[in-house]
Amino acid sequence: MKIYTKGGDKGHTSLIGGERVPKYDCRVEAYGTVDELTAFTALLADKLVGDRFPKSVGQLRRIESQLMTVAALLAVGEGGQGKVASVSDEATTDLEQWIDRMQERLPAITKFTIPGGDERISLCHVCRTVCRRAERAALRAAEQCEVPSEVLVYLNRLSDYFYLLGRTVADRTSTEEILWIP
């Protein structure tokens, strides 16, 4: 099978179900942003491979898989309903449990953190901000077509996960968090 089809050469693409839409369609923007997030999540997992972060790497690999499902759900067009499994409640519950565990182990802060101090911390914040952009794109898509609510919930939780993972990396590497002091 060839990687190119020439079907998109005139600025249109097919959604799951066969519907043809412009490549600037809000659904294409949403699933494209999730695809970008998946790539950054993989990079973050690769950067965390080692003896200090085995659980986090495992979590990130599971998140990558869920993000593929999220992207597929955002790519469903006319005739594609029911062709993609949904994001499970368990996936969101897992995120919430991971968030709670990280938060319990971290010192409380009352100021915003500024990304930096370590490449892995910065990459956590890149993932967080791309996730927020993906969530906004999914919300725009939801205004025009059907987007499963679990997609929106998952993306919302996921950005919190990346924030706390950044703080966790700082804590475990003894990197001082950079706090914003206006």
Where are the regions a protein language model picked out?
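Phosphate/pyrophosphate-binding loop motifs in nucleotide- or prenyl diphosphate-using proteins
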Residues: 1-182
